[in-house]
């Protein structure tokens, strides 16, 4: 009876909150069931919420036919993840995160090159986190060219950088809400438990985001719908990049409000029910960090707001229930396709990343800014009272506004080994940085990282039942860095081979094989580290070739004359029917189709 009364009250509140414009935008969501296509997801306790038509929307998981490689062959050991470069020597490296295609090609060309369905040209607003096992995981929303970010065709896609590897795995579908919008992700490592908060426009004022949690480094996930007592108001269904707990165990998660503001959600029951904290910052995409255990928070940015020519910052003394009047920060303001990020490091220092130039409105940094138009990283020993600000020596511009470098919708995180990771978006393509505090405090630019010497050691991991799960080799270099080096073999629980590859100083070389659980070959890579070329062949279950594509594995991007570790399609991509007859051939040059 209590639940019925609650539903009735909530429905009445929902109708009161709905504007004509919102009802029109939600017209496609008059059904009672939304199917969520994913792999190795299980339903949580809460899988329904009120809809806009006085109905209850049920979210139903639909299993994919195949488990993505991003959720396969994932080690659970955390010991190796603590190995890293010595802390007192500057360390800096940068690589591609995403391949071309799909990144910002003139038409949708990802599937032509063999990428998973749902990986479209626009991969943006990512959640990013370093897993307990040291892997880096990025979850972007992805929307097709010619469709808006709030379109129902938008998906969430995932990409993984395995600990000790130098190159990211190919992006694959994370989940796809059929007839619903997937937009803007946030990943948070909650002391070993990984939380994903995914936005999505126009589902319901009672569904401002969705939740997925993992306790095995992102191999499997539990999906759930947040429970709200009243309809959300003054919000945009876009999580940002900040989440944290208070000393009492309450969870806070940052989200965009309407217009140029941001706010915090709070859950006091491990993510089941949520309330809007009430306060609003002066800035869309604000990045937020606790300054103490008493409720003092610092919010900086993020876009579409400035104060005396600088990006605004706010202080809250009550966990975001209210915010003091904004003051100018020491950083330039941001605009469209730009977002800052802040975290507290293991050392206790704060680190903050941002751009210097407002791209869309073509506004340079205010007078007194000393870092020109560069992307910057800043570090503070005194809770943000003063900052050391340093330019990143390598950066790419926005994919269309190419005059100035940009981190796009940036996220910064720290790995168990102390390295600082930065993920960008909206570049051609997105980049991933690894660096340490010693580099920030130093005057070094790019650093030459030696791969000479080192000791190779064999490792293994077992399933809980004692069955061998993985065996691999890795090298620890004189500076402490750990990279995969030698043969890696992963096994299914029944003992059959799942995946096999050879690494050379963190780079995959020669043949790489990935098998289905029934023993059939799903795909094969052949890489040559002398020519820096690779061939990716995918197979039907009957053993016939499905797609074979050719790749440059040390490409030079369009906007910077510098080689990166990454993937750009170069040469033919041939498609076959299941009976072996040829279906299509696409010729790629520098990641784009020139002939088919």
Regions found by a protein language model. Name each.
Residues 16-17:
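C-terminal motif of bacterial Sec signal peptides marking the signal peptidase cleavage site
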Residues 20, 26-456, 531-532:
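Asp-box/BNR beta-propeller blade signature and adjacent active/binding-site loops
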Residues 447-596:
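Glycine/tyrosine- and acidic-biased, solvent-exposed loop/turn segments at the edges of beta-strands
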Residues 4-13:
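Sec-dependent N-terminal signal peptides
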Residues 8-9, 23-24, 42, 160, ...:
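Compositionally biased, intrinsically disordered low-complexity segments enriched
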Residues 20-21, 54, 483, 568:
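A compositionally biased, intrinsically disordered/low-complexity signal enriched
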